[in-house]
């Protein structure tokens, strides 16, 4: 190392120790939490792999995961954990999250008033929507409305840009359409992923039943399950612990929701179907826009092919003319040389040779054009 060389300190990137969360309970009360991720895992009883999909520093596709005590949502800018009593939303600087938080507070508090504030322990009334369903509905409505608004905004920008491009093909219009097409591709992928998640849930009744947290919470506190307190003990082996956890989960579900699975699934199915239809309409709009873009590209390709054909036609004419002029120039050049031969002593011979050569060149040009037309090289 040289003596005058300075050492540049390298800043080590460390993982984020704590995340900022916004907790909204059944009364609509908002509380800001700045806690470690392990506290959140213990609070909502989920695994680290489930919490990892909510990490803002990592990119994960949209997902709706039903767990024993929580529903994990990763819907673009909405990263939340729904339990039977509260909603934990990851706080971020995204301005699109602000109206979603306000909607959570409003809808959850209104829903709580509709219930009359009657919650007997962890049991929710049969004829009322559970807290987790109301929270899930707010989240799905927010993301569906957000994507629909972005689609409408994209349509307002894309259709005029495409029409202008068909009228005037310039590099500026091409660049503008290229950017809009990239935005459309990203938006279509986002909408398609959420649609796939909803469709996957609708196709599996067990996954939909997993979303009924209040029912499972009520079953967990029933005497049939309390009599087996030894199930709550977890050994040190993570593999055995995971197996016991799954066995307990299956026991809770079989003991509590055996007679009510059908009603639970129907309620969740109606909730998911409504938003599935909404996101499907948004995807149809994007599909129509994609088809319009493809039609515009086909039209532009036809225009480019026509222009290319015109250039080829012009090139053929120039080539034929160049050949004829070259032949004429060769003959005239030979006669213009100072070389003695018998034609020089004959009067008017030069004029006849020049005019005859010009006539032959003209006939040659017409012959080339006729042959090109016969082969339909000119398109007519």
Swiss-Prot record:
Entry's InterPro entries?
MRS2-like
What's its membrane topology?
Answer: Multi-pass membrane protein
Looking at the UniProt entry, the stretches that span the membrane are 316-336, 352-372
The compartments listed are: Membrane
What terms describe the molecular function in GO for this protein? magnesium ion transmembrane transporter activity
A cellular component term from Gene Ontology for this protein is:
membrane
Coarse class of the protein's main subcellular location: membrane
Family affiliation: Belongs to the CorA metal ion transporter (MIT) (TC 1.A.35.5) family.
Annotated protein name in UniProt:
Magnesium transporter MRS2-8
Q: Which organism is it from?
A: Arabidopsis thaliana (Mouse-ear cress)
Q: Which gene encodes it?
A: MRS2-8
């Amino acid at each position: 190392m040289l003596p005058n060389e300075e050492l540049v300190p390298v800043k080590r990137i460390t993982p984020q120790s704590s995340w900022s969360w916004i907790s909204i309970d059944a009364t609509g009360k908002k509380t800001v939490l700045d806690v470690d991720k392990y506290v959140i895992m213990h609070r909502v009883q989920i695994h680290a792999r489930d919490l990892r999909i909510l990490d803002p520093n990592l990119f994960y596709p949209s997902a709706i995961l039903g767990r024993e005590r929580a529903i994990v949502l990763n819907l673009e800018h909405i990263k939340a954990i729904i339990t039977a009593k509260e909603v934990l939303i990851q706080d971020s600087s995204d301005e699109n999250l602000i109206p979603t938080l306000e909607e959570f507070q409003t809808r959850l508090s209104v829903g709580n008033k509709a219930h009359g504030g009657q919650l007997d322990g962890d049991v929710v009334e049969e004829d009322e929507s559970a807290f987790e369903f109301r929270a899930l509905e707010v989240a799905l409505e927010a993301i569906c409305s957000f994507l629909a608004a972005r689609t409408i905004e994209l349509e307002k920008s894309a259709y005029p840009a495409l029409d202008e491009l068909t009228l005037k093909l310039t590099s500026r219009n091409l660049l503008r359409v290229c950017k809009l097409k990239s935005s459309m591709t990203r938006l279509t992928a986002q909408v398609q992923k959420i649609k796939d998640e909803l469709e996957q849930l609708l196709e599996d009744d067990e996954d939909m039943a997993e979303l009924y947290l209040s029912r499972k919470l009520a079953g967990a506190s029933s005497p049939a399950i309390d009599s087996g307190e030894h199930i709550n003990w977890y050994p040190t082996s993570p593999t055995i612990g995971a197996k016991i956890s799954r066995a307990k989960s299956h026991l809770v579900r079989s003991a509590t929701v055996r007679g009510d699975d059908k009603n639970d699934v129907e309620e969740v199915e109606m909730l998911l179907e409504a938003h599935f239809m909404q996101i499907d309409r948004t995807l149809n709009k994007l599909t129509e826009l994609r088809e319009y873009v493809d039609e515009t590209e086909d039209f532009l390709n036809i225009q480019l092919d026509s222009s290319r054909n015109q250039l080829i036609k012009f090139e053929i004419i120039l080539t034929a003319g160049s050949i004829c002029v070259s032949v004429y120039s060769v003959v005239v050049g030979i006669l213009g040389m100072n070389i003695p031969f018998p034609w020089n002593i004959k009067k008017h011979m030069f004029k006849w040779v020049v005019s005859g050569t010009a006539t032959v060149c003209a006939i040659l040009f017409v012959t080339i054009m006729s042959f090109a037309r016969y082969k339909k090289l000119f398109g007519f």
